[in-house]
Amino acid sequence: MKKEVIAHKNPKSPISEVFRTLRTNIQFMNVSKKMKTLLVTSTFPSEGKSWVASNLAVTFAQAGKKVVLIDADMRKGRQYAIFGLSPKPGLSNFLSQVEIGNDGRLSEDVGNFIQATEVENLYVMTAGNVPPNPSELLVSAQMIGLIDSLKKVCDMIIIDGTPSELVTDSVILSRIADSTLIVTAHKITKKDALERVVKNIRNVGGNIAGVVINKVPVSAKKYGERYYYYGEDKILSGKSKKEANINKKQTSAGNFSFEDRLSNEGTYQNKMEQMEEDNFLRNDDEPFWVPEQQNEGENTSNEEILSDKT
């Protein structure tokens, strides 16, 4: 497992606490309707989408929730590398192989396509093989059947989607998910791009939980200027004075079924070789949460926080 999974590698770090705050606020967003599926998307690549999804999934699992993290970026999925798992079988294999009977039952056990992680309660469905038609697979009955099946045995399903400005996959998934979290990057994400993503999701009937603003400069007075990297993505996150008033909301195992594995979970032994970890996030990295509806009296706008470039 890569060190960018800060919530697991260093659960007492400030960044882990930020993700726990995000988890708590997501849980209490709508107490009348329990959220069980959350889609995480971005506008473009390198905004920290997969990093947010993986750490958020870990914090839900740490709270005792049975969590499945689905890597729905079938073009360029990263979750298998983040957690040190086999890249396949995964989502694309499930959607292309499994059939649904007239009674709604799946022809194969979902657990055959899901892998346990070294984090207790957390399972990952990797993206699988790169299919020729990812968008078509996501609108299939198999995708609906997958989510319905997982809802019966899991407390939380987090879907790591694609960048919404590049392909329509995440917009499609926003109709299935209970709500969508949009990850943006300070001084990188363009305002018009974010507006298009929000509009497209709403046009198909999707709900938006809010926006996480990533790569925000850390206050030099409070923490000192720091830049962090992992893989090819430069991550610069933290809390600046301008954002101070924003609310932070935040493998198949044997011959028994996935449902049985959830109720009889044992100690996971990681047999994968340690993957190369060139660079990683520092422990005190902090993303920000901008709720979909801000409280009255707040005058900090997305325009101030995101890129001032057009």
Question: Where are the model-predicted features located?
Answer:
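P-loop NTP-binding module
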Residues: 1-310
